[in-house]
Curated annotation (Swiss-Prot):
Gene Ontology MF: a single term: DNA-binding transcription factor activity
Role of this protein: Transcriptional regulator that specifically binds DNA sequence 5'-AGAAnnTTCT-3' known as heat shock promoter elements (HSE).
Subunit and partners: Homotrimer. Interacts with HSP90-2.
Keyword Methyltransferase: no
Protein's cellular compartments: Cytoplasm; Nucleus
Protein's GO biological process: response to heat
Record protein name field: Heat stress transcription factor A-1d
Pfam families: HSF_DNA-bind (PF00447)
This protein's GO CC annotations: cytoplasm; nucleus
C-alpha cells in the first residue's frame, strides 16, 4: 500500500499527514483490453467447425468466406446477433475495416482478424466520424462517402454485379432496337421528302410551261381558229371510228356466198356479182319482149320462110346453139320468162345471117353455169329445157311450170354490175313494136328471102348487143364477126 505524505504549515510550524493512494480497478483493465463483442462473436462463429459448410476460414487463414449467404442469414445470424439481415452484417463488418477480397464470392479480410490469433482483435477499432470544424468536417464527410461506397460495393458482391450487368445489357439492347427503328423511320421520311420535292419541282415546271404556252397562244391571231379546227377533226375521226365499229347486216337475198370471197376487216372491196346474176338480168330484159315463134330445135328466132330451109341449115343452127344456149341457166330461172313463139322458117333465116358473123365456140370464153343446175336436173339431156313445135305457136316451156310458186324467184333484188354497159332500151322498144309473124305464109320466095335477110341481120345485131352487155362476147370478137358478114 502506498502512503503519501502531505505537509501543512500552521503559522510557525509544519505538520505531516499520511493518506493512502487509490488502487486500480481490475474490471476497468479488462474492459479496456477486451475486443468488441461483434468481433468476438464473429470470430467464434467462423472458428466453429460445425458450421464450416456455411462459413469458414480461407486457405490462407487470413480471411473468412460465407459459402451460403441464405443459410447464414437464416440460421447463424439470429443465434449470434438477434437479426437475420445479411446486409446489416456486411455493413457492420465495413465499420470495423473489413474489405471484400474476392468479388465473385463473399470473402472478407482484416489485418487483425487472423486464425489462431484472437488477441489481435483488440487492435481492430471501430471507425467513428470526426466532429471537428472546417477541414475536419470535410474529412468526415469524405470518409463517410468512401465508407458508403465501399459498403455498397461490399453489399453488391458477385451476384449483384451480374444482375446489374444483365439489366444494363437488356436496357442497351432495347435502346439499340429503338435507335435502329428511328433510323429506318428517318430514312423512309427522307425518301418521301425527296419524292415530294421532285413532284413539286415537276409541277412547277409544268405550270411554267403551261403559262408560257398560254402567253404565246394568246399572242397568236390564228390560235382560236386552229383550236376549233382540231376539235372538229377530232370529233369527225371519233364519229368515223364509231361508224366503222358498227356491224353491217346484209339483206338475205337467198344467194349463197362462198367463204373464200369474204373480205378482210378494214378493206373496201368493190362488189362484183357472179355471172348467173348477170344472166338473170338478161332474162329479165328478154321477159319484156313479145313472144316469138319457136322452130324445130326450140331456138329463139325471128321471121323465117320454111321448115325445109331450116332443116337444111341444121349444122349452122347447132353452132348457134352451142354459142348461146349450150350452157343455159337453170330451169327455175328460165321458167320466170314469158313463152316465145317461132316458126320453122326462122331457123333458116337466122342460120344464114349468123353463120359467118358468129365464130365457133372454141374462139369464145363463156361463163360456166353448170354450178347453178340442181342435182336432179344435171343428168337430164339438154333437150328437156325446150319443147319443139312444128304446128305453129307454142310456148318455149310448159306454162304450168310458171304457176308453181316454188320455182319462182325475185329478179328485182339482183344488183347490176357497174362494169356492164347500160341496156339500150330504145332497141328493146323497137323489138317490142315490131309486128309478129303473119298467119298468111303464101308470099313470094323473093320477098321472104329479102325479109329473112333483113330480119335475120337485125335480130343477130340485137343478140350481139345483148351478148356484149352480158360480157359473153368480147368487143374484139364482135368486130371480127362484123368484118366477115
Amino acid at each position: 500500500m502506498d502512503v503519501s505524505k502531505v505537509t501543512t504549515s500552521d503559522g510557525g510550524g509544519d505538520s505531516m499527514e499520511t493518506k493512502p493512494s487509490p488502487q486500480p480497478q481490475p474490471a476497468a483493465i479488462l474492459s479496456s483490453n477486451a475486443p468488441p463483442p461483434f468481433l468476438s462473436k464473429t470470430y467464434d462463429m467462423v472458428d466453429d467447425h460445425n458450421t464450416d459448410s456455411i462459413v469458414s476460414w480461407s486457405a490462407n487463414n487470413n480471411s473468412f468466406i460465407v459459402w451460403k449467404p441464405p443459410e447464414f442469414a437464416r440460421d447463424l445470424l439470429p443465434k449470434n446477433f438477434k437479426h437475420n439481415n445479411f446486409s446489416s452484417f456486411v455493413r457492420q463488418l465495413n465499420t470495423y475495416g473489413f474489405r471484400k477480397v474476392d468479388p465473385d464470392r463473399w470473402e472478407f479480410a482484416n489485418e487483425g482478424f487472423l486464425r489462431g490469433q484472437k488477441h489481435l482483435l483488440q487492435s481492430i477499432t471501430r471507425r467513428k466520424p470526426a466532429h471537428g470544424q472546417g477541414q475536419g468536417h470535410q474529412r468526415s464527410q469524405h470518409s463517410n462517402g468512401q465508407n458508403s461506397s465501399v459498403s455498397a460495393c461490399v453489399e453488391v458482391g458477385k451476384f449483384g454485379l451480374e444482375e446489374e450487368v444483365e439489366r444494363l445489357k437488356r436496357d442497351k439492347n432495347v435502346l439499340m432496337q429503338e435507335l435502329v427503328r428511328l433510323r429506318q423511320q428517318q430514312q423512309s421520311t427522307d425518301n418521301q421528302l425527296q419524292t415530294m420535292v421532285q413532284r413539286l419541282q415537276g409541277m412547277e415546271n409544268r405550270q411554267q410551261q403551261l403559262m408560257s404556252f398560254l402567253a404565246k397562244a394568246v399572242q397568236s391571231p390564228h390560235f382560236l381558229s386552229q383550236f376549233l379546227q382540231q376539235q372538229n377533226q377530232q370529233n369527225e375521226s371519233n364519229r368515223r371510228i364509231s361508224d366503222t365499229s358498227k356491224k353491217r347486216r346484209f339483206k338475205r337475198d337467198g344467194i349463197v356466198r362462198n367463204n373464200d370471197s369474204a373480205t378482210p376487216d378494214g378493206q373496201i372491196v368493190k362488189y362484183q356479182p357472179p355471172m348467173h346474176e348477170q344472166a338473170k338480168a338478161m332474162f329479165k330484159q328478154l321477159m319484156k319482149m313479145e313472144p316469138y315463134k319457136t322452130g324445130d330445135d326450140g331456138f329463139l328466132l325471128g321471121n323465117g320462110t320454111s321448115t325445109t330451109e331450116g332443116t337444111e341449115m341444121e349444122t349452122s343452127s347447132n353452132q348457134v346453139s352451142g354459142i348461146t344456149l349450150k350452157e343455159m341457166p337453170t330451169a327455175s330461172e328460165i321458167q320466170s320468162s314469158s313463152p316465145i313463139e317461132t316458126t320453122p322458117e326462122n331457123v333458116s333465116a337466122a342460120s344464114e345471117a349468123t353463120e359467118n358473123c358468129i365464130p365457133s365456140p372454141d374462139d369464145l370464153t363463156l361463163p360456166d353455169f353448170t354450178h347453178m343446175l340442181p342435182e336432179n336436173n344435171s343428168e337430164k339431156p339438154p333437150e328437156s329445157f325446150m319443147e319443139p313445135n312444128l304446128g305453129g305457136s307454142s310456148p318455149l316451156l310448159d306454162p304450168d311450170l310458171l304457176i308453181d310458186d316454188s320455182l319462182s324467184f325475185d329478179i328485182d333484188d339482183f344488183p347490176m354490175d357497174s362494169d356492164i354497159d347500160p341496156v339500150d332500151y330504145g332497141l328493146l322498144e323497137r323489138l317490142l313494136m315490131s309486128s309478129p309473124v303473119p298467119d298468111n305464109m303464101d308470099s313470094t320466095p323473093v320477098d321472104n328471102e329479102t325479109e329473112q335477110e333483113q330480119n335475120g341481120w337485125d335480130k343477130t345485131k340485137h343478140m350481139d348487143n345483148l351478148t356484149q352487155q352480158m360480157g359473153l362476147l368480147s368487143p374484139e370478137t364482135l368486130d371480127l364477126s362484123r368484118q366477115n358478114p
